[in-house]
Amino acid sequence: MKYAIVEISGRQFWIETGKYYDLNRIPTELEKEIILNRVLLANNDGEILIGKPYLDSVKVKGKILEHLRGRKTIVYKMRPKKKTRKKQGHRQDLTRVLIEEIKIN
């Protein structure tokens, strides 16, 4: 099983080929290929490579499928014994990326 742990926009993701992941918004066009080069760990069928902090020999190639928005999160604040209430919603901008290849040199 080939997988990699990649850092994207400050978060770490366990990535496998052929699957898609919802990441924070990446400002690029649809159907464009991207290269993820901040690879922290790679597993090539039992051979584990660990970066310090990143692996220069491993590149992850993906394709942007769509831009979407996440589920709505409700933020509700109130002060007890007062008439102060504040209800606010938030939807995160996301980008769906299909991982096509994990290339290990």
Curated annotation (Swiss-Prot):
The keyword Ribosomal protein appears for this protein: yes
Ordered alphabetically, the record's keywords are: Chloroplast, Plastid, Ribonucleoprotein, Ribosomal protein, RNA-binding, rRNA-binding
Keyword NAD included in the entry's annotation = no
- Provide any one GO MF term from the record: structural constituent of ribosome
Kindly list the biological process annotations in GO that this record carries: translation
Under the heading InterPro entries, the entry gives: bL21-like, bL21-like_sf, Ribosomal_bL21, Ribosomal_bL21_CS
Q: What is the superkingdom listed in this entry's lineage?
A: Eukaryota
Entry-linked Pfam families: Ribosomal_L21p (PF00829)
Compartments, as annotated in UniProt = Plastid, Chloroplast
The record's GO CC annotations read: chloroplast; mitochondrial large ribosomal subunit
Q: How does it assemble?
A: Part of the 50S ribosomal subunit.
Give the record's family classification: Belongs to the bacterial ribosomal protein bL21 family.
> PANTHER family given for it?
50S RIBOSOMAL PROTEIN L21, LARGE RIBOSOMAL SUBUNIT PROTEIN BL21C
Function, as annotated: This protein binds to 23S rRNA.
Per its UniProt record, what HAMAP family does this chain match?
Ribosomal_bL21
UniProt name for this protein: Large ribosomal subunit protein bL21c
The organism named in the record is Thalassiosira pseudonana (Marine diatom)
